[in-house]
Structures are given as C-alpha cells and as structure tokens.
Amino acid sequence: MADPRLTVVKMLMKMDSSEAYSNLLLDHVFSETDLSERDKAFAAALFYGVLERRLTLDYIIEKNSKIPFAKLDPAAVEILRTGLYQLLYMDSVPESAAVNESVKLCKKLKCFSAQGFVNGMLRSFIRGGKKISYLGLEPEKRLSVEYSCPEWLTEKLIREYGTDFAVKALKASVGRPPVYARVNTLKTTTEKLLAELSKHRIKAEAYPGLENCIRLEKPGDIEKCAPFRQGLFHVQDISSQLCCLTLRPVVNETVLDVCAAPGGKSFTLAELMGNNGKLYSMDLHDMRVGLIEDGASRLGIRIITAMQNDASKFNAELPQADRVLCDVPCSGLGVIRRKPEIKFKSPSDFDGLPEIQYQILETSARYVKPGGTLVYSTLSLIHISEPTRPLYIS
C-alpha cells in the first residue's frame, strides 16, 4: 500500500519542477497508485492545503531556520511544508504523527542529513505553541503571509478595491471551496436528483436563487457515484452557470462556445436549449476536445459538435450564430481557491493575456448574427485580463 504522505511530497516536488496543473497531476497520480479511498482523501487535503498555504509555511521555515531558505534541500522543504501544514491546519492528525512521519519521509527520500533538522524544527514549533509571529511586518506583508498570497497581488487588491474588500477577498481565497453542480434537466429534476444522491449517502441541497443548481457537501470521488455515471448532473461553479444563463439560449438556435473545454458551459447551454438546435463547442487543444465529447455522451447530449479551433483566428467554416459565449483564457485569479498554484505566478506571466483576449473577442463578434447576443466573461479580480482598447461591433 502506498504512503499518502510520500505521495504528496513527490507531487509537490513535481509541481515545483514543472508547470503541472494541480488537479490533473492529482488525478493522474491517484489513477496509478494503490491508495485507499481514505488515504486519497487525506492526500488530496494535504496536497491542496500545502499549495494553498505555501507562502505561510515558507515564512515559518525561514523564521525558524539558521540555514538560508535557498540552500535547503528541496525534499526537506517539501517535508517541512507537509509537516507544518498538518500541525497547523489538520486537527485530526496527532502532533506526534505529524513529526514522526515527517522524519520517516527523510529516510524514504534519502535525505538522511535532514532528519535532525526536520525533527528539531517541527518539535520547536510545537513547543512554541504553534504560533506565527508577524512582529515587525508591514500591513501588506502581514496580509500576504497570513493569507498566503503574494505581496504584489495583495498590494494590487488593496490599491484597486481598498483594504476592507481586499481582506475579504483574501479570506475567501483560502479554505475548502464548495462544490456546485448543474442538474441535467434532460434526464431528471432537482428533487429527484437530491433523492438519488441521498440514496448513495451524498449530502446535497438545492442552491437558493439559482434554479437547477445544487451544492454538494463532502462529495468525495464524485465521478464514481452512480448518479454521476448515469449523467444526472455535471460539476460546475456558480459563476460558470451564470455565464450560460446570461447568454439565454433557446430551442433550435445556433450557439458557439468558443473556449469550451472541459465542457461544463456547453453542457448547461445544451440543457437550456432542450437538446435541440446546434451547439459548437471548441477548444484550442485537440486533446481537450475529447473531454467535451465524453461529457456530452455521459449526459445524453446530442446537439454538441466538439472541435479543435483557434478562437483568436476567424474560421469561415463556422456558421453565423444566434448566440456566442466568449469565456476567454484569463489569469484565473478569481478561482485561486480551486487552483492555488495560480497565485504563485509572477505578474509577467499574464502580460500577453489582454491582447489574446481582445483577439478572441474581436473574432467571436464576427460570428454573431445581426440582433444576436455575445457574452464575454473572465475569471479575474484584478485589472490584468481586460481588453485595453474599445471594440466596435457593427
């Protein structure tokens, strides 16, 4: 049986050495290991937790290490991060287990010289009451450390929205995100789906104010449950659902979803259309088109044509559409609670986004029929991902 802590440390090292997506890496590793369901749940919580709180954890390591952070063994750093996270944020883990298992990881990863260092730092942190000292930090730096958010992003939030809103946003950026799903109205109703989920011991409730939306509580490996496999729902954030409702497609229309993968928005659009009409779901990467096709098949949706297409370049083979959804590539800073690695990008990583977004918007506008509708959406809190010049649509 695989060791969940060792699995997590190896995944974290992979994240540090590549540009892997946390969710895809986790799915890949879990599919190839023999972890029990309980160990998978623990490993997922620890993995995402360390990514989310990395800046805070590194601050603690730096404050308690006589060795400069940059000179520490990378494996020892990951072990310390996981150990400290368990001590601070996982009440179910005994302190002794957090320490002892961390020391064992040093042996398993052959960083023998770090055993005493790891053991000493974790035990010293416990003796100190597991307190984090913010003494002497400037307000922006303290917020950055407390909520594990890069200083440049903290300062930008304060500058654009004020301190009160920035603090609320930072608080909302950490912690376990809720899981929402869209009821597949082609197959069932909200009431019937909730009853079916209850039979499988999955707690869920209707989300107030948004028809056919439910909130799942502790869903676990939701893709393995029978209602999911039967295509009774698909997982989709509220913001994504609202994009589709704003577009307001109806039966027998022609609709384009120009940046569609993995397909959640297209599925909701198809359901709103009653599975009648034409819906073109496109993505730049051919391998992601398969995700759309698989999801549509599971949900019983037949009106979707999934295809590879570069949304920034006009495709004369596409039809004129009644409605176009333009959910452009963006910084993703509005969803960092789900993808915590995003906030550790540098500002320069987003430099090319506005131009790409403008090209996609300008191209998408050319597909809209006279009197048609185009909805443009982006998942960003700060002014990185917005077109910087006006677009005139005739």
Question: PLM features: residue spans?
Answer:
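S-adenosylmethionine
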Residues: M1-R389
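Hydrophobic alpha-helical segments, chiefly the membrane-spanning helices
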Residues: I393-S394
